[in-house]
Curated annotation (Swiss-Prot):
Disruption phenotype: Mutant seedlings show increased sensitivity to salt stress and abscisic acid (ABA). Belongs to the splicing factor SR family. RS subfamily. The gene is RS41. Sequence repeats lie at residues 267-278, 279-290, 291-302, 303-307. This is Serine/arginine-rich splicing factor RS41. Pfam families: RRM_1. Its main location: nucleus. It comes from Arabidopsis thaliana (Mouse-ear cress). Residues 73-92, 168-356 are annotated as: Disordered. One of its GO terms (biological process) is mRNA splicing, via spliceosome.
């Protein structure tokens, strides 16, 4: 009897679902379920041919997946095959672990498999994974004897399929052994660290993992400067021609300028300002209000008189000072008045001479 390969169905599909699907075309002897595919054994090959023609590329399941149904490429043998023919057809090396499929996954327990395989040798471990199981024997001869006796036998009204596992458990540690996790963990500890971990553990990772190196970098005089040139204010202070005159010290000590001078150039404020700040204030400071009033309004008569007197007294030490109107009157009274003649004084001098 040649099995029919059926694949591409949903992973949650059950053996009873496939059996019900193929039963429409003939009698189904058994279904060997795998992960994602199955082998369907039908009693008559002509019925199997009909099933292949009808079900290949057939949309099946909730998602409408297209089935792949065809003859198996290698003849897996019939129900009356022996263990020797089974091993020769599969080409697997004998091992201590047997691979069991096609049992009732919903109702079969570990104890049921132990009772079925115990008569042929001492069992080390039994593990069930969804719809397949692994039976591990203590000796390889016991596993061979169990395979010859239990393959195509009935377990809880199901015809099971038994074959050798791909690798031997205790020598290979391939995952079929119950010691899988204990075998893998020491290997992981002995394994060399990954390049990512080596990179993170190295002192050159990122900006430096060592706090000492970080402190050494911060205390360096070049830390944080990069390629930026010093601010104009710093260049003026570092210049040998920088002078600390008395007026500058007085302005720095004044409470008005202290708030501006205390701004740190490291915060980016001093770099955009022209050096030094107090010079800009001197140039940009507007004259006092009384000067604006004096410039905007027309000068009074005594200012005109003062301008004339200023041209004569440029050599005087008082030249350039702002004089009050009272001072101007005192000066004019002391040195003689050269302004416009008073009509009272001019009347006797401009009167026509008396006729003799």
């Amino acid at each position: 009897m040649k099995p029919v390969f059926c694949g591409n169905f949903e992973y949650d599909a059950r053996e009873s679902d496939l059996e019900r699907l193929f039963r429409k075309y003939g009698k189904v002897e058994r279904v060997d379920m795998k992960a994602g595919f199955a082998f369907v054994y039908m009693e008559d090959e002509r019925d199997a041919e009909d099933a292949i023609r009808a079900l290949d590329r057939f949309e099946y399941g909730r998602t409408g997946r297209r089935l792949r149904v065809e003859w198996t490429k290698n003849d897996r043998g019939g129900a009356g095959r022996s263990g020797g023919s089974r091993r020769s057809s599969s080409g697997l090396r004998p091992s201590k672990t047997l691979f069991v499929i096609n049992f009732d996954a919903q109702n079969t327990r570990t104890r049921d498999l132990e009772r079925h395989f115990e008569p042929y040798g001492k069992i080390v471990n039994v593990r069930i994974r969804r719809n397949f199981a692994f039976i591990q024997y203590e000796a390889q001869e016991d596993a061979t004897r169990a395979l010859d006796a239990t393959n195509s036998s009935k377990l809880m009204d199901k015809v099971i399929s038994v074959e050798y596992a791909v690798k031997d458990d205790d020598s290979r540690g391939n995952g079929y052994s119950p010691e899988r996790r204990r075998d893998r963990s020491p290997d992981r500890r002995r394994r060399s660290p990954s390049p990512y971990r080596r990179e993170r553990g190295s002192p050159d990772y990122g900006r430096g993992a060592s706090p000492v190196a970080h402190k050494r970098e911060r205390t360096s005089p070049d830390y944080g400067r990069g390629r930026r040139s010093p601010s104009p204010y710093k260049r003026a202070r570092l210049s040998p021609d920088y002078k600390r005159d008395d007026r500058r010290r007085e302005r720095v000590a004044s409470p008005e300028n202290g708030a501006v001078r205390n701004r740190s150039p490291r915060k980016g404020r001093g770099e955009s300002r022209s050096p030094p700040p107090y010079e800009k204030r001197r140039e940009s400071r507007s004259p006092p209000p009384y000067e604006k009033r004096r410039e905007s309004r027309s000068p009074p008569p005594y200012e005109k008189r003062r301008e004339r007197s200023r041209s004569r007294s440029k050599s005087s030490p008082e030249n350039g000072q702002v004089e009050s109107p009272g001072q101007i009157m005192e000066v004019e009274a002391g040195r003689g008045y050269d302004g416009a003649d008073s009509p009272i004084r001019e009347s006797p001098s401009r009167s026509p001479p008396a006729e003799e």
